[in-house]
Amino acid sequence: MILDEIISKTKINLENIKENLPLCRLENALTNSYIPRDVKQVLKQKNSINIIAEIKKASPSKGVIKEDFDPLKIAFEYEKAGVSAFSILTEPFYFQGSLEYIALVRRYTNTPILRKDFIVDIYQIAEARLYGADFILLIAKALDKFYLKTLFEYAKSLNLEVLMEIHDETDLEKALFVDADIIGINHRNLQTFDMDMELCIKLIPLIPSGKIIVAESGLYNNSELINLKKQGADAFLIGEHFMRQESIYNAVKDMKGE
């Protein structure tokens, strides 16, 4: 299973990182870090297509997606096109990501940043805060509900928002147990990488009002976004489609219907 494999490798890598910089030293360094920006405000704008645009070099299923990968150049195009937030992959082995991409983009742009990774430890949340992320991804499928709540509350204590990703009703139960306020519905099954494009239609009616809902994966045109917005989605996480376009700026504008 792909998800299990990635998480196993993440845990091993994390132990090595912790040896060089223990959590107590990492937390002490947070006093000099950026102040997180208001993510919820930008994701729930009613009169716009709110896009979380991904900065992603590779994936386990597709390999290298963008050969000429320049995270800052991509971020500039996204920002010029008016995206609501960036999603920056930081997982190094399967997605060829890096925390340094967050630090770089944070330094030169004003758009909120999601650390997209396979977070299994509070250490990674402290890292996200130190490098300049404004919110983090937690994958409900990867962890039990009690540990999810521990991670969620730690993130909140650092003033980071959390995008809680779900794929089925069991995941949704975990998200509601945690009282997540931003819930992402991933059309892609992270165990098999199969897609279910009807998932938002099935799950959105089960989510209490007042939650911010993000539709994720497999979105390619403006009409899909408009339809999902009518169903109750507030924002859309889009990555691979933009990475494959010659003009990222034009691709975002097309997606937004502008």
From Swiss-Prot:
Give the record's keywords alphabetically: Amino-acid biosynthesis, Aromatic amino acid biosynthesis, Decarboxylase, Lyase, Tryptophan biosynthesis
Q: List the disulfide bonds.
A: none
Q: Which pathway does this polypeptide act in?
A: Amino-acid biosynthesis; L-tryptophan biosynthesis; L-tryptophan from chorismate: step 4/5
CDD domains annotated for this entry? IGPS
GO terms of biological process kind: L-tryptophan biosynthetic process
Q: What's its top-level EC category?
A: lyase
Write down the superkingdom of origin.
Bacteria
Spell out the reaction equation it catalyses.
1-(2-carboxyphenylamino)-1-deoxy-D-ribulose 5-phosphate + H(+) = (1S,2R)-1-C-(indol-3-yl)glycerol 3-phosphate + CO2 + H2O
Q: What are the GO MF terms of this UniProt record?
A: indole-3-glycerol-phosphate synthase activity; phosphoribosylanthranilate isomerase activity
Does the keyword field hold Phosphoprotein? no
Question: Any idea of its EC number?
Answer: 4.1.1.48
Q: Which HAMAP family match?
A: IGPS_B
- UniProt record similarity statement: Belongs to the TrpC family.
Q: What is the protein name given in its UniProt record?
A: Indole-3-glycerol phosphate synthase
Q: Which organism is it from?
A: Campylobacter fetus subsp. fetus (strain 82-40)
Q: Which gene encodes it?
A: trpC
